[in-house]
Amino acid sequence: MVSASGTSFFKGMLLGSISWVLITMFGQIHIRHRGQTQDHEHHHLRPPNRNDFLNTSKVILLELSKSIRVFCIIFGESEDESYWAVLKETWTKHCDKAELYDTKNDNLFNIESNDRWVQMRTAYKYVFEKYGDNYNWFFLALPTTFAVIENLKYLLFTRDASQPFYLGHTVIFGDLEYVTVEGGIVLSRELMKRLNRLLDNSETCADQSVIWKLSEDKQLAICLKYAGVHAENAEDYEGRDVFNTKPIAQLIEEALSNNPQQVVEGCCSDMAITFNGLTPQKMEVMMYGLYRLRAFGHYFNDTLVFLPPVGSEND
């Protein structure tokens, strides 16, 4: 029979051990904020320099631009059904192909689990096996994300999809660096091929959660380590993130607060690819501002042109 003092001692030991583990693990969590530099094992991915294209004919550039084919995967759950309708009619039309997977209602996810990592694995495997030969880049985003596909293609223009690329907005979690799904995740065809092989192995990409549940984007990063691939943070030439995890209004508010003299420069990159946390109405506003509104007499001397798919009925 254990005495009351003995019971209290063991309880204290147990609580102390748990507290030490949690403090140790939480103490290792570091999130890289915009504008804050840290050393990484990999380089930061940046777009090509437009001067590199000046001596290349427009015909060749157009053909090269057509060779970049992006498959968009909209993955997630939304209580607001209008998201799906707006997504179909706005930025996803600029993808070479886009499919929307509602993790709550889609038949593809008729599996014995509500686990987001299992659902993400299912989506990636399904897309690659069905479309892997026809597209060289695969972009996964949440229903609340707005993406500028032309800027994504510009970032990828000089990248070889036969190499394993895993890029977006990187976050550090303990010893793990991963691309957060809130900013969108980009995988090259070669990496999708490797991931597909890994997913056939139930052990290498199994659920890695131990004390608490790990999110699907962290699980993906752990899985991709088996392919020898690490996350890459995408930036412009000013070092600003191009995959944003917040809505543009919030980024502007932060810039006004932090540096009111340079709001435009401090807010966002002019080559931004994603913004997250948008309502369906805000997505419509973004579409108007990006593709409809024109400043009379202002001419953008862009070297490259990325045209939306034929029949997209979208500028």
Curated annotation (Swiss-Prot):
UniProt KW keywords: Glycoprotein, Membrane, Signal-anchor, Transmembrane, Transmembrane helix
GO CC terms for this protein? Answer: membrane
Q: Which residues cross the membrane?
A: 9-29
Task: Give the primary localization class.
Answer: membrane
Topology Cytoplasmic: residue spans:
1-8
Gene Ontology MF terms in the entry? glycoprotein-N-acetylgalactosamine 3-beta-galactosyltransferase activity
Glycan attachment sites: 55, 301
Query: Ranges in the Lumenal compartment?
Result: 30-315
- Name the membrane topology term: Single-pass type II membrane protein
Tell me the compartments it is located in: Membrane
Q: What InterPro entries does this protein's entry cite? A: C1GALT1/C1GALT1_chp1
Q: List the disulfide bonds.
A: none
Family as reported in the entry's similarity comment: Belongs to the glycosyltransferase 31 family. Beta3-Gal-T subfamily.
> Mind telling me what this protein is named?
C1GALT1-specific chaperone 1-like protein
Q: Which organism is it from?
A: Homo sapiens
**Designated gene of the protein:** C1GALT1C1L
